[in-house]
Amino acid sequence: MTFSIAELFEQHSTDKFDLHERHLNNQMVRMLKTIGYDRHYQRAVGQYLYDQAGTEYLDLLSGFGVFAIGRNHPTVINALKETLTLELPNLVQLDVSILSGLLAKELLETTPDNLDKMFFCNSGTESVEAAIKFARYTTKREKIVFCEHGYHGLTMGALSLNGEEIFREGFGPLVPGCSPIPFNDLEALEKALSNKDVAAFIVEPVQGKGVNVPDDNYLPEVERLCKKYGTLFVADEVQTGLGRTGKFWAIDHWNVKPDMICMAKALSGGFVPVGAVAMTHKIMDSVFNRMDRAVVHGSTFAKNNLAMAAGLATLHVMEEEKLVENSLKTGTDIINSLNALSGKYEFLKEARGKGMMIAIEFQSPKSLTLKAAWAMLEAANKGLFCQMITIPLFKEHHILTQ
């Protein structure tokens, strides 16, 4: 009897919600059904999803930043098919692979020139976990400083650096020595670092939650202060990297040189998870400092051939299709066009962001009638007004966003 994924899809095309309710997270199913997002998607191409009726949906969530080159890009599909047909030796744990070496070389050509070593893992949160360990070992310090409202993942170490209480609630005690400070606040940062006992300061160049863009002097001063107090500067580019902000790395907007860059999401091409940390030679040599420490940190499936092939193909597509340049131009046009409407609509405060990493912020209107409606919604649930926009966008205009 042959095994066929296509047959499984055909047999169970309408079973996914029932299967998840029975065997997975039933609260996710309840939420989707409650807000009317319970669609049976059958196909995905580029930025579009298609349901059973052939209805086209514009996916602005992009898998939370995964699909920088669109869904099911043929170049990545062909690279994965070719990798499978070659019958390559994979995950030979007492060996090193060609593809991981090539991907490391390609990535390091895009990073600041002080970074010349790569560590591969399977996800963004794993890259943050690695950065925590590497920073502590290299500096011989325990403390990690992070930003309020920041997001770095949900595994225990990364969760300890999560600036949103809803994710942390009930999972303590978390990793000790992790302290939050306000984002874009240099005075708070210097105060936190001044005792010279902080291993690393980790920050998203543009915060993913809310798309908060720092002042132009912020990251250059972060770099200076970290050097002054012997703290490693870690840029979390899991959300912002690979062209999303209109530069290959968001840090390129400010020409800073962190000690480590965490990356993942878009590097996968939307297929095989891959995460990585770019770092200085000094950090790599400090952690992996003897032959008996050659495997002191790692992951079983890191550097697997499919993940590395997906990463190489993704970088090729980004260069060939000039996606970074397109992100800058298109994003600037969108932000400017939306801000031009702010005088026309009372609720619209501003559109902000970098490249195609964009947020629209709403505000309390001035007219009494609308102001009362706003106050009522805010009192009921602080995020309710935005839901009243995103749900009709989905149901009436077939746009998926949050």
Each language-model region and where it sits:
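Conserved N-terminal phosphate-binding loop of PLP-dependent enzymes in the Aspartate aminotransferase
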Residues: 2-402
